[in-house]
From Swiss-Prot:
Positions with a binding annotation for ATP 2: 668-675
Role played: ATP-dependent chaperone part of the 55LCC heterohexameric ATPase complex which is chromatin-associated and promotes replisome proteostasis to maintain replication fork progression and genome stability. Required for replication fork progression, sister chromatid cohesion, and chromosome stability. The ATPase activity is specifically enhanced by replication fork DNA and is coupled to cysteine protease-dependent cleavage of replisome substrates in response to replication fork damage.
GO biological process: brain development; cell differentiation; ribosomal large subunit biogenesis; spermatogenesis
Tissue and organ expression note: Expressed in testis; with localization to spermatogonia and early spermatocytes in the basal compartment of the seminiferous tubules (at early stages of spermatogenesis). Very weak signals observed in spleen and skin.
Region ranges (Disordered): 1-38, 202-227, 239-315
Name listed for the protein in its UniProt record: ATPase family gene 2 protein homolog A
Annotated positions binding ATP 1: 394-401
Biased composition (Low complexity): 15-26
EC number: 3.6.4.10
One Pfam family recorded for the sequence: AAA
Length: 893
């Protein structure tokens, strides 16, 4: 049978049908096939891009394993539909794919997907050899795969099962890449060695020499050594490197560096000698090895990822050789690759020293976590059950995940990370099985910590669950946490959870015995922000003094740790732009030494980086200062007392035993600068400013208006210290019983507003500032002390205030010397501030109307403007405010 096959191969080689069987003259006078195809060999096709959506009948999962060919091309190459074909590039890289016909596909071309082009090492327009597989295709009994270090946390048993399921029937060669989606994560593996059911082993022998320029492992050729005598092999072995493919000569198969290993037989490896690269080296080790001196046992040496995860370029297989495919009975051996990133990992390893502003929380966390893990016997001796779980909760960006990473690095325990959304599977029972396996592995490798990030996504409240999967996951996690310690690992396994929505967690999860302790990681205060900034700038070149850092920390109201880190990055970019603007052509080495961050860089960065909680309610604070408002000095003082003093002098308030005012109401006639005062307060105080217009909160759906009020106060607490400004409060806080709307929406909104301002939940570092011109319509419950402590009447401007308002306007307008300021002050009696500004604008327009090129405003223009703009607040309204003030006894200024 073998003689017939040999005669057939010689006949095909004589006809030039197969490039891999083409004869070449050798030193011994025998003919041997080429190791690599020549560009002019038969079967060479031009690579083109894969055609998408050609055949809807082909499942999407199989499309990446196909190559597209024209019908005529398949006929001429004797390729059958749906049969495997061997792709061989000019560099010797090989892959096996399935041939698939495409109607109208151009002749002489082959369509490859992007992944196939990458694996074989070709691009569109290059040539590649396509041959049908004529040799036997047997099952692979065993296969060694290289697993990247980045996938080291993956469970090997489950990954092996996933590979056998998804790659069943895949024909593999040493050096090929395999891609497998594991729980939504794409894993890339490389075939190191394949052992068939016939005992033949195809493998890759790794070079341990660091001087290899390519840094790649050699592939071993496949040869039938069962019928070949060792002495015959040695007598025919050529120890000189062939000069060209045409002069290559060996008595074995042409692929010079693949190994064949049959059980109980001699191992023969042929590679280049590391000494001079001009010959072949021999080494004897329990048989005969021809390999590098340093590569004794390729599998016992840690192999770098750069050397493994590259396709082999040397050595090819003939299409008449024996090939092996993956089956359900194939045994998979996963070998992890050591990477060179250990130094980088240690450089960026998170430690306790890198966390700022959380000293008290870190102390409590270390007591809860480190003591049970390091001294479990101490708890047993006193009969104290060790805590099983610790829950960290707080707003996003405060450092919950960073604390967990620091704990994992500092404690030295085995850490298993569960990202809630990642392990959720659509298949029944798969999510619970994954959870059980993680807990079982942590128990075996104790002391260990199981960190569950975004716990609310994994364990929401069961009564509000969208599907049965969520309920089963919650029940499974409850059972697993109750079972911690049942195998004798009491106190040696701890679950650390993190969430920013603790109210969304299932109540059963938060009871003692599961998550025993809950620690809030809140928004940092000024002192904590200073600590965070100092640790962030520890390794950053800057010119900030301690006083400037303190000022920066005091101004960064509502910034969390993530915001401060983003602020430092933005300040660094500002500093870099400043240097490059002056000297744009500087080399990188000189720029690095010149860039130093200043306080001005941080102040500019704060204009771009706002607190995270303020981004959804971002408001451009108007550039209005106290100096832009004429007069009203007493009102300015009262507002500073209510807003700025509690922040700048908190010890004075504590010493006096008083609480800062919670609310300030400004009321008075329209146009008397009530809203402008609020703008100036927002700008001058530097606090986070939330401007709310009363009618915007009203919603026709039941409960939505109250929810909007509740959400406003929640955001204000999150970015405290902050100011909530309610303009036109009379539209929102209407006196109860006066509303005629359906469902009494106004009454419910008012009740929610009263509860938020002075309810069970304390309103800390949040000041409510309101403005209205109808104080008589506001409910009396809102006007009492404890809710609105300061009620300030803003009357029409007096003579001194009108003088300041006119002076401010004259600074920006060209006024003629004939204009008498005192006379204007007298003429604008009973005018509001807005009407005085309107008089000035009208006079300017009259001057332009008279002469478009006018360069100043004359007295006659003001006289005419005063006749056009008249006081619009009647005497009755002024008397109303005065009577209301006297009857209600409200505090006035």
């Amino acid at each position: 049978m073998s003689s017939k096959k040999n005669r057939k191969r010689q006949k095909e080689g004589a006809e030039g049908a197969s490039p891999s069987l083409s004869a070449a003259p050798s030193r011994s006078g025998t003919s041997t096939p080429f190791a690599q195809p020549s560009p002019a060999a038969p079967g060479m096709l031009v690579v083109t891009n894969f055609l998408e959506k050609v055949d809807g009948k082909v499942p999407k999962t199989f499309q990446n394993s196909l190559v597209h060919l024209g019908l005529n091309t398949m006929k001429s190459a004797n390729i059958c539909i749906g049969r495997p074909v061997l792709l061989t590039s000019l560099d010797g890289k090989q892959e096996v794919y399935t041939a698939w016909p495409v109607a109208g596909f151009p002749g002489g071309k082959v369509g490859l997907s992007e992944m196939a082009q990458k694996n074989v090492g070709v691009r569109a327009g290059e040539t590649i050899q396509v041959q049908p597989l004529l040799g036997a295709v047997l099952q692979a009994q065993e296969m060694d795969l290289a697993l990247s270090d980045k996938d080291k946390e993956i469970n090997e048993e489950e990954l092996t099962g996933c590979i056998l399921r998804k790659l069943d029937g895949k024909i593999v060669l040493p050096g090929n890449f395999l891609y497998c989606t594991f729980y939504g994560r794409l894993c890339k593996l490389q075939v190191l060695q394949v052992k068939g059911t016939d005992g033949t082993t195809l493998g890759k022998l790794q070079s341990a020499s660091g001087t290899d320029a390519q840094g790649m492992a050699s592939e071993h050729s496949s040869m039938e050594s069962s019928d070949v005598d060792l002495s015959f092999q040695l007598s025919q072995l050529d120890l000189k490197e062939p000069q060209s493919p045409s002069s290559q000569s060996t008595p074995c198969k042409p692929t010079n560096d693949r190994t064949v290993n049959k059980a109980g037989e001699v191992l023969l490896d042929v590679t280049q000698s590391p000494r001079d690269g001009s010959g072949l080296g021999l080494e004897e080790s329990t048989g005969l090895k021809c390999s590098f001196d340093s590569s004794k046992e390729g599998n016992t040496q840690p192999v770098s990822e750069e050397k493994l995860l590259k396709p082999a370029s040397a050595g090819t297989k003939s299409n008449t050789d024996t090939f092996y495919f993956i089956s359900s009975t194939t045994r998979i051996n996963l070998r992890k690759i050591c990477t060179n990133s250990k130094e980088q990992d240690s450089q960026f390893k998170v430690t306790y020293d890198m966390i700022g502003g959380l000293n008290s929380q870190l102390k409590a966390i270390r007591e809860i976590i480190e003591l049970p893990l390091k001294q479990p016997e101490l708890f047993k001796s006193y009969g104290i059950p060790a805590p099983r779980g610790l829950l960290l909760y707080g707003p996003p960006g405060t450092g919950k995940t960073m604390i967990a990473r620091a704990v994992a690095n500092e404690v030295g325990a085995y850490v298993s990370v569960i990202n809630g959304p990642e392990i959720i599977s659509k298949f029944y029972g798969e999510t619970e099985a994954r959870l059980r396996q993680i807990f079982a592995e942590a128990t075996l490798r104790h002391p260990s910590i199981i960190f569950i990030d975004e716990l609310d996504a994994l364990c929401p409240k069961r009564e509000g669950a969208q599907s049965e999967v969520e309920k089963r996951v919650v029940a499974s996690l409850l059972t697993l946490m109750d079972g911690i310690g049942s195998e004798g690992s009491e106190g040696r396994v701890l679950v650390l959870g993190a969430t920013n929505r603790p109210q969304a967690l299932d109540a059963a999860l938060r009871r003692p015995g599961r998550f025993d302790k809950e620690i809030e990681i809140g928004i940092p205060n000024a002192q904590d922000r200073l600590d965070i900034l100092q640790k962030l700038l520890r390794r950053v070149p800057h010119l900030l003094t301690k006083a400037e850092l303190l000022r920066l920390a005091n101004n960064a109201h509502g910034y969390v740790g993530a915001d401060l880190k983003a602020l430092c990055n933005e300040a660094g970019l500002h500093a870099l732009r400043r240097v490059l603007r002056k000297q744009p052509n500087l080399p990188d080495s000189k720029v690095a030494g010149m860039v130093k961050i200043t306080l001005n860089d941080f102040l500019q960065g704060m204009n771009d980086i706002r607190p995270s909680a303020m981004r959804e309610v971002a408001i451009d604070v108007p550039n209005v200062s106290w100096s832009d408002i004429g007069g009203l000095e007493n009102i300015k003082l009262k507002l500073k007392q209510a807003v700025e003093w509690p922040l700048k002098h908190p010890k004075s308030f504590n010493r006096m035993g008083i609480q800062p005012p919670k609310g300030v109401l400004l009321y008075g006639p329209p146009g008397c600068s009530k809203t402008m005062i609020a703008k100036a307060l927002a700008n001058e105080s530097g606090l986070n400013f939330l401007a709310i217009k009363g009618p915007e909160l009203m919603n026709k759906y039941v409960g939505e208006s109250e929810r909007a009020v509740r959400e406003i106060f929640r955001k204000a607490r999150a970015v405290a210290p902050s100011i909530i400004f309610f303009d036109e409060l009379d539209a929102l806080a209407v006196e109860r019983g006066s509303s005629s709307g359906a469902g009494n929406v106004a009454d419910r909104v008012l009740a929610q507003l009263l509860t938020e301002m002075d309810g069970i939940e304390q309103l800390k570092n949040v000041t409510v500032l309101a403005a209205t011109n109808r104080p008589d319509r506001i409910d009396k419950a809102l006007m009492r002390p404890g809710r609105i402590d300061r009620i300030i009447y803003v009357p029409l401007p007096d003579a001194a205030t009108r003088r300041e308002i006119l002076n401010l306007q004259f600074h920006s307008m060209p006024i003629s010397n004939e204009v008498d300021l005192d006379e204007l002050v007298l003429q604008t009696d009973t005018y509001s501030g807005a009407e005085i500004i309107a008089v000035c604008k009208e006079a300017a327009l009259l001057a332009l109307e008279e002469n478009i090129k006018a360069d100043c405003i004359m007295k006659r223009h003001f006289t005419q403007a005063l006749s056009i703009v008249t006081p619009r607040i009647p005497e009755s309204l002024r008397r109303f405010y005065e009577d209301y003030q006297e009857k209600s006894g409200l505090h006035t200024v």
